UniProtKB/Swiss-Prot annotation:
The keyword Cell membrane applies. This is A-type ATP synthase subunit D. Keywords: ATP synthesis, Cell membrane, Hydrogen ion transport, Ion transport, Membrane, Transport. It comes from Thermococcus gammatolerans (strain DSM 15229 / JCM 11827 / EJ3). Belongs to the V-ATPase D subunit family. One of its GO terms (molecular function) is ATP binding. Pfam families: ATP-synt_D. Has multiple subunits with at least A(3), B(3), C, D, E, F, H, I and proteolipid K(x).
Length: 214
């Protein structure tokens, strides 16, 4: 049996508890609907994350292959000099957006792909293999930033799902059962009190009639 609430067994408390149960059940339904919607959104984004991860792994494989080719064709030292001469890439701005009531990151950045002349090593190395390797790693960077945003969104949605689940379970298995058990107890207690009053009045009536007869 569920634990009872510490309230007085009165009709006022009975009415109050019935109202609270109605509100709790409405709240439970809203939270359950929210939980279901969050789970659907989570798996939609999860599928996107899997696709991005596959694409990233493929592009990283290609990028390292082109880097190895550039090292063979241009030489280790010229490649290192080109890497040291590369200008910093564009800045990334992290904002916030709302997904199902959850604040998640929104990474705003223009594409990382640049022309060879914009990378800073144009006069250091003219090998086309270095340019190809740089281009492939810029593609990797584009995907990595997008994947980071999606994976962080998944983490936050997962936390919100867990929080919502705990609230749903608390209402379903603890709060509502306790209130319903208390309502049942108050009804029983009020019935007992009503019977006690009935028999008390009956005895009083009998005493009055007995005295009147004597």
């Amino acid at each position: 049996m569920a634990e009872l609430l510490n309230v007085k067994p009165t009709r006022m408390e009975l009415l109050n508890l019935k109202r609270r149960i109605q509100l709790a059940k409405k709240g439970h339904k809203l939270l359950k609907d929210k939980q279901d919607a969050l789970i659907m959104e989570f798996f939609t984004i999860y599928d996107e994350a899997l696709q991005l991860r596959r694409e990233l792994n493929e592009k990283m494989g290609v990028a390292f292959e082109t880097l190895t080719r550039a090292q063979i064709e241009a030489g280790t030292l010229p490649l290192r000099e080109a890497a040291l001469a590369v200008k910093p890439n564009k800045e990334v701005e992290i904002k916030r957006r709302n997904v199902m009531g959850v604040s998640v990151p929104l990474i705003e950045a223009e594409g990382f792909k640049r022309k060879a002349s914009e990378r800073g090593y144009a006069f250091v190395s003219t090998s086309p293999f270095v340019d190809i390797a740089a281009e492939k790693f810029e593609e990797v960077l584009d995907l990595a930033v997008r994947l980071a945003e999606v994976e962080e969104t998944l983490k936050r949605l997962a936390r919100e799902i867990e929080t919502t689940k705990r609230r749903v379970n608390a209402l379903e298995y603890i709060i509502i059962p306790r209130m319903e058990a208390t309502v049942k107890f108050i009804k029983q207690r009020l019935d007992e009190m009503e019977r006690e009053n009935f028999f008390r009045l009956k005895r009083v009536k009998a005493l009055i009639e007995a005295r009147s007869g004597s």
